[in-house]
Amino acid sequence: MKINIKEFTGKCSCGRDHQLVVDDVILEEGALKKLPEILNKEPYNQYKHLVMVCDDNTYEAAGKEVEKLLNGISVIKLDPENLHANEIGVAKVKEQLDPIKEVDCMIAVGSGTIHDLTRYNAYERKIPFISVPTAASVDGYVSTVAAMSWYGFKKSMIAESPILVVADSRIITDAPMRLTASGVGDLLGKYTALADWKITNILDGEYICDCICEMEYDALDKLKESLDGLSNRDINAYEELMYGLLLSGLAMQMTGHSRPASGAEHHMAHFWEMAVINDEIDAYHGEKVGVGLIQVSDIYHEAVKYLKEENFKLEDHVDIETDLIEKTFTNKELCESIKKTNDPNLLDLINPKVLREKTEEIIKIIEEIPKADEIVAMLEKVQGVKSLEDIGFTPDMKEKTAGVAPYIRDRITFMRILKFYDFYDDVIK
């Protein structure tokens, strides 16, 4: 599948001049074997001292081949057990990276964690890196930030975006199905992310790019058509999934933020990853996003029932729930960080009168989101996790999460806006 990067750059009807950091994306069967040829051409032939970062599993999947193809490359191979994108993982990479005298480019061979550890270390060294994904498991391959758990804080750290992506669809097709299901969950999460973006746009005029929204909806349509193919290991279906995930990352570069890819569903996933009211859970990021999506879809569609009745009441003003934040985030430093994130109060931007006037438009936007049972059916096709219980939670985690998760990011979502409505407590249960 050919991805023409130039199609995503330049002047757009939204009024912005979209730019990308990544120079090229190659997504096709046998792409890995082209790596030496690609690196011998400009602008990549300037890099003479390459270091590959992988773990034991991704070394077997693709790293071993990269080592053969690129004679003399240095290899940092990590133990995948308990390997996370955190300060410990960063230190493990640095421990092997620091003794290497000359490094002018890094290569990440793996999925989400390996990429975040590589991009963070590349940023610290002020050198570029190349992405070699081994699974269609996450949308962050071309991200400009590293999603890190930093001393217990869930943070988006400034980091390097890859200058080149070489995604071999045969390797991706052969990845464990659980990783693929994680990617499906992450990509499906764009339904609520886009809805949150569109609702905020009509309420407070936040910038939005309709072209990016349409690109992502098109990728979602193709994903739905590819679900049977994914379960049958059809390489074309895997290319469609990988394309959608890469497109999501490119959309973030085009806008300069994560709005096109992250909404209330991601806030739930990130909240669980912080483990403030729950233990650490053994679930991939995309699995948590998929489960979060199901909860958000259920809440939003339940809200539509009340919106259609038109007899709801709205608060004149919604204050930050400081007591809830303090009760939830018992670590003093973390609590202060969350409070700072919510100062000023984003809901001050929402005019209740406008909120009521836009009811029909809000209903229309929410009805574009598949209902919870439809999402469950899609995830079942790829053997994905599909409930709170599947990731180790009890059903009451839905209400606990819905109330506080909006506060972990300085971003308006409909989940946060729901706090204006008198039916709020009923729909989050």
Spans of model-derived segments:
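ATP/NTP phosphate-donor binding region
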Residues: 1-105
